[in-house]
């Protein structure tokens, strides 16, 4: 079974007669025996690897909230309102996974969830001389494999004179590198509400 163990430290405080509230938490979560797909099988098998308890993860995250609530008289009746802002973030890495070849298409130890591998862009080719002096990358450009001025120039990270993905493994990624991450970062939420004369409204916005 999948098991999660979380360690958490934080604080909560109320100031100005409980009108101002501040809370902060930092946590680290270890997930073991995560239920997920197994390492990819050769294409000759004609099917995907079965799922199982194949991976372990480590997550670091934090949450911060600041709130204010108060009341005053409006039209002879109490008008109360509250506003609360929250922001949080988390990152997760694979700590265990059976991937003996280090294939980039699967989980591997040290992989950050959501990471995007790709080629680093150096700009655009200015002219034919620029193309001739750069690493060979014609197979990345067009169906006719001809590189032309104005097309994207990719970085030759391993300095082997050609732009490719190598063995597509952690040991030999060719010119591939991590160029981004699709996991949302620095999520936020805002809660606003008021109550007056038996009428109450509460709203919540959330984004990244």
Place the predicted regions along the sequence by residue.
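Extracellular/periplasmic, surface-exposed regions of secreted and cell-surface proteins
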Residues: 1-120
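Generic recognition of flexible, low-complexity loop/linker segments
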Residues: 9-11, 52-53, 177-179, 188-191
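Conserved small-residue
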Residues: 55, 71-182
